[in-house]
A protein has these predicted regions:
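N-terminal cationic and glycine-rich segments that engage phosphates or anionic surfaces
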Residues: 1-19, 23-60
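Internal alpha/beta loop-helix hairpins
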Residues: 46-79, 83
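Non-DNA-binding regulatory cores of transcription-related proteins
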Residues: 75-155
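Conserved, well-folded catalytic cores of nucleic-acid-processing
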Residues: 21-24, 32, 36, 65-72, ...
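Short, charged, intrinsically disordered terminal tails
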Residues: 1, 152-159
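Glycine-rich, flexible loop/turn motifs
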Residues: 2, 38, 70-71, 81, ...
């Protein structure tokens, strides 16, 4: 079984999500199934089928998150030097063509959230940045073509 890298806060969020699914989402969908059953014929009961579909999704998600948390490896960010881009570091880069600056933190695949500036260690841009230092340029191949970025800063987050 492969370990799944997490920041401390990222694993906490996943555990909260799992707890919410087990304590709130699961009981709600079980109740919805029970109510829908009372409406009679299950063959043509759209409410029942929708609730069963939601239950399958929730149970699948619970199984996935239980597996992921059992294989979680929290990376101690206090041990990072900040000299190179690594898992957990925050990096400020600039698009060499448009001069647009972007901030990212390199995190595990289950905590990635582009809106929050959290990118997966497995993403093309993170793979290009890993191991690089401030001032270095990287080329990132995307479906839209190759983009060139310069690393402006590397920071080790407080936690």
């Amino acid at each position: 079984m492969d370990k799944v890298p997490f920041t401390f806060s990222g694993l906490g969020k996943i555990k909260l999500e799992l707890d919410n699914l087990k304590k709130f989402e699961r009981p709600q969908v079980i109740q919805a199934i029970s109510v829908a059953r009372e409406h009679g014929d299950l063959k043509e009961n759209a409410e029942y089928h929708a609730a069963k579909e939601k239950q399958a999704f929730i149970e699948g998600h619970i199984t996935e998150l239980e597996d992921v948390t059992s294989r979680a490896e929290v990376i101690d960010l206090t041990r990072l030097s900040g000299k190179t881009v690594t898992f957990g570091t925050k990096v400020n880069i600039v698009d060499e063509e448009s001069d647009q600056e972007t901030n990212y933190q390199i995190v595990g695949p289950y905590e990635a959230n582009l809106k929050e500036g959290l990118i997966s260690v497995a993403s093309p841009i993170a793979r290009a940045l890993i191991g690089k230092e401030v001032g270095m340029s990287v080329a990132v191949t995307t479906p839209g073509g190759t983009k060139n970025y310069e690393i402006l800063t590397i920071e080790v987050p407080k936690s």
